[in-house]
A protein has these predicted regions:
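Intrinsically disordered, compositionally biased charged tails
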Residues: 1-19, 239-304
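Residue-level signature of catalytic and energy-coupling elements of molecular machines
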Residues: 29, 85, 177, 229
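Small/polar loops that bind or transfer phosphate-bearing groups
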Residues: 87-88, 180-181, 218
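Alpha-helix N-cap/loop-to-helix initiation residues
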Residues: 92-93, 185, 222
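Long, charge-patterned amphipathic alpha-helical coiled-coil/hairpin "stalk" segments used as oligomerization
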Residues: 103, 108-214
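Short glycine/threonine-rich loop/turn motifs
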Residues: 188-191, 195-247
Length: 304
């Protein structure tokens, strides 16, 4: 284990309500930022140090900011409001769709349509058209059309489903958006800021955190990191929905990385200054996490 991790283990920490442990964040590779040459100076406050020219994110701050973000979305959903999940790049798309749809929240996991927030009336027209086509299919009316017309409508349906399918049940503008990679989703972030919609985001070391209402510093490229952070946010939304509408989120008691939080008995991490928080991580785990980061960065470049 490197000196960096030894130093990290012995850093004094404050007692806090923990949604997910630092160890779980570490094993998911959340601490791996980008290469130092891609570092954004505005992210310096969230960086613990560097290792092999890779910026290492301070997971104590990640945990703290993630807990704050989780509390925020739970509060939003407890009032019957909606959080829109946004993650269109390859490493985020599947997770965003699976997690958001599991509790009926809106999401955008394909291409972000310009005007989704700033020109909602036009987007709503596309959503209405999607509902009309779905009604044609469910009622069997589409079978009465000639083959050419039916094929054209099916193509239109596929196109609309890809572009607005994740937000087809959204009745109006969301009360907050959760974003994976603010640099990649800059148009969505700009639209949210213009409309006064709070932005909660997973922000990597190469991004600009300015203008983001709630920054969760962390690896926004590796699938394991994205899945863990998104899962915490979704579970917090589920708790909010449960308290507002009697919604019962699916159980996740068997998850090895998420701690179950009971409202009556909150879990408090009490860490003495001399106690190590992060258990020793094997070289194999470190290398695997680094390779995952590099692979995701390569995929990111291919997407562009």
């Amino acid at each position: 284990m490197s000196q960096l991790y030894r130093d990290w283990r012995l850093t004094p920490r404050r007692n806090k309500l923990s949604i997910v442990s630092v160890k779980d964040l570490l094993h998911a590779g959340v601490h791996f930022g980008h290469q130092k040459k891609f570092w954004n100076p505005k992210m310096d406050q969230y960086i613990f140090g560097t290792r092999k020219q890779i910026s290492i994110i301070n997971l104590d701050l990640t945990q703290e900011h993630l807990s704050a973000a989780a509390s925020k979305v739970e509060d939003i959903c407890s009032k019957g409001n909606k959080v829109l999940f946004v993650g269109t790049k390859r490493s985020a798309s599947k997770t965003i769709k699976e997690e958001a749809s599991s509790i009926g929240l809106p999401y955008v996991n394909k291409r972000w349509l310009g005007g989704t927030l700033t020109n909602w009336k036009t987007i709503r027209g596309s959503i209405r058209r999607l509902h009309d086509i779905e009604e044609m299919v469910s009622s069997g009316r589409i079978e009465k059309l000639i083959k050419k017309e039916a094929v054209e409508i099916q193509k239109e349906h596929a196109k609309l489903e890809a572009s607005v399918g994740g937000i087809k049940d959204m009745k109006g503008l969301p009360d907050a958006i959760f974003v994976i990679d603010v640099k990649y989703e800059k148009i969505a972030v700009l639209e949210a800021k213009k409309m006064g919609i709070p932005v909660i985001a997973l922000v990597d070391t190469n991004s600009d955190p300015d203008g983001i209402d709630m920054v969760i510093p962390g690896n926004d490229d590796a699938i394991r990191s994205i899945r863990l952070i998104t899962k915490v946010i979704v579970e917090s939304c589920a708790r909010g929905l449960e308290s507002s509408k009697g919604f019962i989120p699916k159980s996740d008691k068997d998850s090895p990385i998420i701690q179950t939080i009971k409202k009556e008995e909150p879990v408090i991490e009490e860490v003495a200054a001399e106690e190590p928080v992060i258990e020793e991580v094997s070289d194999e785990e470190e290398v695997a996490a680094e390779e995952s980061k590099v692979e995701e960065n390569e995929n990111k470049e291919e997407d562009k």
